[in-house]
Regions:
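Alpha-helical packing segments of well-folded alpha/beta enzyme cores
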Residues: 63-67, 71, 96, 119
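A contiguous, mid-protein "functional segment" used to position or interact
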Residues: 111-138
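Structural signal for well-ordered, non-membrane alpha-helices
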Residues: 40, 68-72, 124
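GST superfamily/GST-like fold recognition
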Residues: 81-106, 123
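Acidic, serine/threonine/proline-rich low-complexity intrinsically disordered regions
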Residues: 54-59, 105-112
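Surface-exposed helix-capping loop/turn segments at secondary-structure junctions
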Residues: 73-84, 128-133
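Acidic/histidine-enriched, glycine/proline-rich intrinsically disordered or flexible terminal extensions
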Residues: 136-152
């Protein structure tokens, strides 16, 4: 939950994820509500049309274009959504943009969203992402446990 993330970062924010930037808190909250209520709903129906009996997954895909364009416009001003470095807002949104792209990479990559794609690919190609998204073999209860430190 975003409330838990905010609480944790108010307690300890070593990477300045709560930095002030071009957006005020009301604007940030509005973006997160749009992500939670609209974008994710349409993403699920685009990604899993059979689960939702959706006959037109492209309809739900296209409903998210307005949000993607809005993010692209924000990224024209910075390398991140709110300030010059990635912040809580970026980390809250990036996984869902990645999921959206993964449904149809060719279609997504053909979109005229230069800044959004640059932002996404910089994250996907980062050491930070590689360290947290490392692939492991299917867990077997008889194997030695794997411990990670998620350092990057």
């Amino acid at each position: 939950s975003i409330d838990i993330i905010k609480w944790a970062l108010k307690t300890n924010d070593p990477k300045n994820w709560l930095a002030e930037g071009q957006l005020n808190q009301i604007e940030i909250d509005k973006i997160l509500i749009t992500l939670e209520c609209d974008f994710k709903k349409n993403l699920d129906r685009y990604k899993y049309p059979n689960k939702y009996d959706s006959n037109n997954k492209d309809f739900h895909r296209d409903k998210n274009l307005k949000f993607l364009n809005y993010l692209n416009d924000l990224l024209k001003k910075n390398n991140a959504l709110n300030c010059p470095h990635l912040s809580m807002l970026d980390y809250a949104i990036l996984p869902f943009i990645r999921q959206f792209r993964n449904v149809d990479e060719l279609w997504f990559d053909a979109l005229d969203l230069i800044f959004l794609k640059k932002w996404l690919f910089q994250f996907i190609d980062s050491n930070e992402f590689s360290s947290i998204m490392k692939k492991y073999n299917l867990w077997d209860p008889n194997q030695t446990p794997i411990y990670t430190n998620f350092s990057y």
